[in-house]
């Protein structure tokens, strides 16, 4: 019997995708070989590669103004690639909303970029999204869409005249996005859209001009990968294969509007369980900034019960509920592949646990 997996990433995958990958693992589409065994230069793999890029653009409703890049190194490599490629000679502005923005700021500073932190919620342990106003003439403005550790999320992105950079690693493909002022939108796919080893970057083509005539190593230059259709070197072929299966699954769900609707229902159910617990459970994030993806909470009346909660949840068939080591507590990551019944099972367990130990 499969466990209900609330892991923050890598995370649970739709069962039908796992079953399809299992079916095709040794014999891809009846060809007599695995997709893992063939060259990335073959027509067979190129159909997967380019098909995945087109379907990703289709889900977000993007036209040819954007390039889709498949890269390696995780989203963390983008912390350096972004300033390397997109910083000019001005100020690069960052909103600091958690661990991942702090790391991005640090990487930009290492590169000698003129970094300005224009807003931060660190003083309140990142329990909210701070109000931010980016200047009009910065080289770029940078935000992290969703914060896996602290359970906060931008409900709407800031409207800026300067190019907006969005780290969407933990709410990738979970909702429709207004790209009108987004210059680069990226994430590792292992939470909501596949397995680890692949990063997907949507970059507006005019931004590629910034990489020209810069002394950047080829592998770290966006232009290199755009000009070579993300085939400059051997790509993570199996991760891209899993990614196209995820794109097909999302399209079959009805697209991102339908996916967002389901995600909202799941989150509402879980937050209601916390809010109606008479203070037994307490969420970390301010209500107005609560994440639809990651629900971080404590057993407020007795935090010593939290390890027992995780243990008994595992015994009941639910894994991945231990909070991040930085914040502690309990965290339920309810990404796209988790369904409403699975979240309902967690809520029922929470009520039973409260009944035993309140």
From Swiss-Prot:
Binding site for L-glutamate: 41
Disulfide feature: none
InterPro entries on file: Aminotrans_V_dom, Pser_aminoTfrase, PyrdxlP-dep_Trfase, PyrdxlP-dep_Trfase_major, PyrdxlP-dep_Trfase_small
UniProt pathway: Amino-acid biosynthesis; L-serine biosynthesis; L-serine from 3-phospho-D-glycerate: step 2/3; Cofactor biosynthesis; pyridoxine 5'-phosphate biosynthesis; pyridoxine 5'-phosphate from D-erythrose 4-phosphate: step 3/5
Compartment annotation: Cytoplasm
Annotated catalysed reactions: O-phospho-L-serine + 2-oxoglutarate = 3-phosphooxypyruvate + L-glutamate; 4-(phosphooxy)-L-threonine + 2-oxoglutarate = (R)-3-hydroxy-2-oxo-4-phosphooxybutanoate + L-glutamate
Alphabetized UniProt keyword annotations: Amino-acid biosynthesis, Aminotransferase, Cytoplasm, Pyridoxal phosphate, Pyridoxine biosynthesis, Serine biosynthesis, Transferase
Claim: GTP-binding is one of the keywords in the record: no
Function: Catalyzes the reversible conversion of 3-phosphohydroxypyruvate to phosphoserine and of 3-hydroxy-2-oxo-4-phosphonooxybutanoate to phosphohydroxythreonine.
Family membership noted in the UniProt record: Belongs to the class-V pyridoxal-phosphate-dependent aminotransferase family. SerC subfamily.
Protein name from the UniProt record: Phosphoserine aminotransferase
Organism the protein comes from: Campylobacter jejuni (strain RM1221)
Organism ancestry: Bacteria, Pseudomonadati, Campylobacterota, Epsilonproteobacteria, Campylobacterales
């Amino acid at each position: 019997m499969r466990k209900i997996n609330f892991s923050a990433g890598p995370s649970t995958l739709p069962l039908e995708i796992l079953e399809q990958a299992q079916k095709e693992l040794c014999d891809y589409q009846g060809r007599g070989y695995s997709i893992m065994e063939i060259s990335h230069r073959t027509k067979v793999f190129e159909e997967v590669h380019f098909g995945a890029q087109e379907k990703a653009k289709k889900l977000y409703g993007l036209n040819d103004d954007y390039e889709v890049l498949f890269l390696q190194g995780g989203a963390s490599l983008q912390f350096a690639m972004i300033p390397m490629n997109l910083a000019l000679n001005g100020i690069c502005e960052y909103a600091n909303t958690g661990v991942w923005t702090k790391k991005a700021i640090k990487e930009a500073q290492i590169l000698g970029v003129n970094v300005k932190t224009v807003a931060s919620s660190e003083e309140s342990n990142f329990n909210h999204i701070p109000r931010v106003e980016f200047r009009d003439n910065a080289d770029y403005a940078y935000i992290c869409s969703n914060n896996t550790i602290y359970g906060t999320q931008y409900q709407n992105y800031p409207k800026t005249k300067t190019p907006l950079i969005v780290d969407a690693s933990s709410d990738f493909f979970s909702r429709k996005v207004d790209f009108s002022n987004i210059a680069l939108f990226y994430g590792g796919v292992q939470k909501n859209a596949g397995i680890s080893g692949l990063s997907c970057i949507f970059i507006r083509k005019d931004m590629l001009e910034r990489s020209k005539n810069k002394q950047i190593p080829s592998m770290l230059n966006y232009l290199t990968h755009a000009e070579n259709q993300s085939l400059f070197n051997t790509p993570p072929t199996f991760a891209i294969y899993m990614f196209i299966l995820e794109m097909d699954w999302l399209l079959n769900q009805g697209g991102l509007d339908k996916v967002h609707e389901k995600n909202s229902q799941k989150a509402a159910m879980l937050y209601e369980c916390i809010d109606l617990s008479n203070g037994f459970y307490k969420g970390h994030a301010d209500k107005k900034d609560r994440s639809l993806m990651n629900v971080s909470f404590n057993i407020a009346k007795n935090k010593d019960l939290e390890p027992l909660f995780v243990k008994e949840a595992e015994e009941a068939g639910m894994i991945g509920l231990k909070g991040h080591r930085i914040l502690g507590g309990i965290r339920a990551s309810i990404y796209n592949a988790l369904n409403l019944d699975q979240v309902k099972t967690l809520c029922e367990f929470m009520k039973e646990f409260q009944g035993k130990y309140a």
